[in-house]
Amino acid sequence: MNPTPLESRFDTYAAYRQAVADTVMLARRELVVFDPDLRETGLESPAMEQALRAFLSAGRDNRVRIVVHRPDEVERACPRLMAVQRLHGHGLSFRQSPEDLRHLSDCFLLADGRHAVIRFHADHARGKLLIEQPDEVSGWRRRFEDLWGLSVPAIASTTLGL
C-alpha cells in the first residue's frame, strides 16, 4: 500500500534529518543522494546506519547511489557509512561531482522516484519533503541521472594494499 501523498516544508536541521529518515524508511528499491558532503543528512547516525543496512539487505537489487562534491570529507566524517559500504559495496556507490559543477548548492535525496527530500541550499536547513509525488520527483530524478553521468567514481568499497 502506498503512503498518502504529502508535501511539507521544514526549516530546521532536526526536521530535515527526520525527513531524510522518513524517506529512507519508505525506500523499497533505490535511494539516490546529491549533497556536497552529507554532513547534515543524518545518514551517519546509528539509526540510519541500521536502516541503510536493512534496506541493502532486503533485496540484492537494492541500490544507494550518492554524488558528493567532497568525498574525502565523507570518508573522514562518516565511518558508519563507510562500514555500510564495506559490507554492501555492491549496493552503495559514491561518485564525485565534476569540478565545474561544484558550485551547485542544493541537496536532495530521492527514494524510488516517488519520494524526495530537497534542501534549497546546502548552507540552510530550509526545504521540503515530498511523499508519493512522482510527477514532481521526476525532474529531480533526471537531474540526478545527469549528475551521476558526469561524475567520476569515488570512495572505493575496498582498500587495496600489498
What are these regions (language model features)?
Residues F10, F120-L162:
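Signature of lipid phosphatidyltransferase scaffolds
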Residues Y16-R17, M48, A77, W140:
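Amphipathic coiled-coil/heptad-repeat helices and related helical stalk/stem segments
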Residues A14, A54-F55, R63-V64, E145, ...:
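Terminal leader/tail segments of proteins
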Residues D35, R63, V68, L92, ...:
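Long, hydrophobic, amphipathic alpha-helical segments used as structural scaffolds
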Residues T23-H88:
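Primarily the HKD phosphodiesterase
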Residues M1-R39:
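Interdomain hinge/linker segments and adjacent boundary elements that couple functional modules
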Residues L31, S93-W140:
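HKD (HxKxxxxD) catalytic microenvironment of the phospholipase D
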